[in-house]
Regions:
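Cell-envelope/extracellular polymer assembly enzymes that use nucleotide-activated donors
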Residues: 4-6, 38, 190
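Donor nucleotide-sugar binding loop of glycosyltransferases
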Residues: 14-17, 46, 75, 101
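Short, well-formed alpha-helical segments that are part of the catalytic scaffolds
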Residues: 14-30
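Conserved donor nucleotide-binding strand/loop of the catalytic core
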Residues: 37-40, 51-85
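A conserved acidic beta->alpha catalytic loop
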Residues: 43-52, 98
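Acceptor/aglycone-binding surface of glycosyltransferases and processive sugar-polymer synthases
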Residues: 69-85, 90, 102-185, 210-227, ...
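Short active-site alpha-helical segment characteristic of glycosyltransferases
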Residues: 187-194
Length: 242
């Protein structure tokens, strides 16, 4: 690769899953030939050994940093913290469970270079044949309904905004994330909405994905997220993303 990369991992009580995730990412980065690569683990107020596990991995990969949020502030807060601190020219945020294999970063990079985009959105919905392990019937269909309402509320064209695998050109990321208001799960829709509002080209890219047991988001809590696209629209009307 000809550009440098920061990989941001928001983590809350990920002591058990994080070691394997970091091993896979470190191995990938060593194979990739990046001129500079860093891993940023953003601890969101974990009460287990997440921070210790991440710091131990620094012995194997010195360009690994651990950022700590002031308490459990939410996934959106954690991703913003990492994006505003990263040093690479590109910045990927990936869920700590690696439900999308880290190798799919190559796919996002190719899409950005091919289409001249500043944001690449990993998508489960564009090609569902790439899903190895599906979510439950209930969760998958809740996701479809959410997407329809999200598109109605925001005008965004994407078929999947909630896949935790997105790549940003770092200068664009700083402009987007400094305007972000949502600290919880609704931040994905918000940052894509802000990017589109700023005129940044965003491309949706099909990626491999597998449902990994151990989600910290209940289906009913996810239902509350149906309000988020409407809050984004309301914030836009009020001029809060200027």
């Amino acid at each position: 690769m000809t550009r440098s990369i920061s990989i941001i991992i928001p983590a809350y009580n990920e002591e058990k899953r994080l070691p394997a995730t970091l091993r896979l990412i470190i191995a990938y980065l060593r194979r990739g030939g990046w001129p500079f690569a860093e891993i940023i683990v953003v601890d969101d107020g974990s009460t287990d050994g997440t921070v210790q596990v991440a710091e131990q991995a620094r012995a194997e990969f010195p360009d690994l940093r651990v950022l700590r949020n002031p308490g459990n502030r939410g996934k959106g807060y954690a991703v913003r913290h990492g994006m505003l601190e990263c040093r690479g020219e590109w910045a990927l945020y990936s869920d700590a469970d690696l439900s999308t294999p880290i190798e799919e970063l190559d796919t996002l990079c190719q899409a950005i270079e091919r289409d001249g985009a500043l944001v690449a959105v990993g998508s489960r919905a564009l090609d569902r044949r790439l899903i190895g392990v599906h979510q439950s019937f209930f969760r998958e269909n809740i996701g479809r309904v959410f997407n329809l309402l999200m598109r109605l509320a925001t005008g965004l064209p994407f078929h999947d905004t909630q896949c935790g695998f997105k790549l940003f050109e770092t200068r664009a990321a700083r402009e987007i994330f400094r305007r972000q208001l949502r600290d919880g799960l609704g931040f994905d829709v918000e940052v894509l909405f802000i990017g589109r509002r700023l005129g940044y080209r965003e491309v949706e890219v099909p990626v491999e994905w597998n449902d990994v047991p151990g989600t910290k988001v209940s289906a009913w809590r996810g239902l509350l997220g149906f309000l988020d696209p409407w809050l984004v629209r309301w914030n836009s009307i009020r001029g809060r993303y200027a």
